[in-house]
């Protein structure tokens, strides 16, 4: 009987907390999304933007979601449009400090993924890095998992983004 509390503690530590459930997305097709023309600020100072996101994350106890892509990329623009939908935007703002980084045609701001040990060419975009406020990557090996965003449902994309919440 004295082992029950220890067993419960061990189960909690090994299983961890569950991620937050993604909001229900009010559309079923990505064709219903208003797709922005240029969601990535081409001349932005990505290093400063990412540093500021981490400063806010440390203050607010949130994770950082770094959305890397380019304005030429249809999947990147579709994902950006989905993330602006009110139901998903509110969810993301509650759980993450969101920052967008223009990687051009895989030739700009590559020092950002390098901060997290990604020193080879990105597999595709959009590429999403989720990190703790201390800078520890949470989704290693899954950074380019939604590079084919246009072939996913809006709900599947929201669920993918939600799985990395604390």
Predicted regions span which residues?
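Bacterial N-terminal signal peptides
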Residues: 5-16
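N-terminal leader/targeting and pre-domain segments
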Residues: 21-60
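Short pre-active-site segment immediately N-terminal to redox-active cysteine/selenocysteine motifs
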Residues: 61-64, 69-72
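The canonical Cys-X-X-Cys-His
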Residues: 73-77, 128
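Typically the conserved alpha-helix immediately C-terminal to a functionally engaged Cys/Sec
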Residues: 76-91
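Thiol-based oxidoreductase modules, predominantly thioredoxin-like and allied folds used
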Residues: 88-110
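Structural alpha/beta surface segment adjacent to cysteine/selenocysteine redox centers
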Residues: 104-125
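Non-catalytic, surface beta->alpha helical segment in thiol-disulfide oxidoreductase systems
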Residues: 122-166
